[in-house]
Amino acid sequence: NGDPVGIACAMKNAGVGVGIPDWGRCKLIVEADEKVHIYSGASCIGQGLGTVLVQVVVTNTGLHRDNIVYERSNTWIAPDSGDTSGSRQTLVTGEATRRACEKLSAALAGKTLHDLVGQEFYGEYLAKTDPLGADVPNPVSHVAYGYATQMCILDRETGRVKKMVAAHDVGKAVNPLSCEGQIEGGVVMSLGYALTEQYPIDENCKPTAKYGMLGLFRANQIPPEIQAIVVEKPGLNVAGGAIGIGEITSIPTAPAIADAYFRLDGQRRLTLPLENTISDRKSGSAG
């Protein structure tokens, strides 16, 4: 119908990479309640890692969900699994958990959880990569990459973002609904980066604006439609083929929006937030 359309593509590594040790660790303990308790020092900060690890255990042991308990990470009993960054936890800790499941499954042969009370099953995985500049054939900077294409559709009459479409190659979607949520959340975050948010600082990197003046994106500014497309593609031979989908969801959004505005008025916008958009012209919502 003649509405301006912008498109952008991105790629993003999963894991720390570049030769830095990148460990995932997990301990499965059959406790007195005759259930398998999952312990890992990987912080679950909203990305759904706990759900993923439970699914990994159920899938790889055949145990019922009711027999699995995810324990929040702690430094007392949970093995260190690195920080929650770099879109790494589903991959590295997911694989560590899968390896622990192999040991648990072997012990369960001909037995029940009642027979295994008090036993621990440990798994770890090191995502091996090469340092930058390594003099080796075919150096590996990261163990996996995610890919994405996002599209922005503007309403030609109002200049508002009408729809966002985000297609992401996630390898294997352990939890498809969670993947969609990650995509939608990342798009909304980047809509803020693109259209409204600023974080001004002085020459000493001290913030110069109050929190309420940062232009944080609000719920009533979200576009009418965000379409998340989860693309599954085999290839990775660890963690069931899952590739992290955290940070990449926020990368191509702003460029896609900038491209759409360029097609609307021919102006290239090269700084964030984008200048002379609907959020600048009017006080109404950006979406």
Could you describe each region identified by the protein language model?
Residues G50-T51:
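Conserved strand-to-helix beginnings and helix N-cap segments that scaffold or border functional pockets
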Residues K35-S40, V161-K163:
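Short, aliphatic-rich beta-strand segments
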Residues N1-I29:
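Accessory "access/gating" subregions that flank catalytic or transport cores
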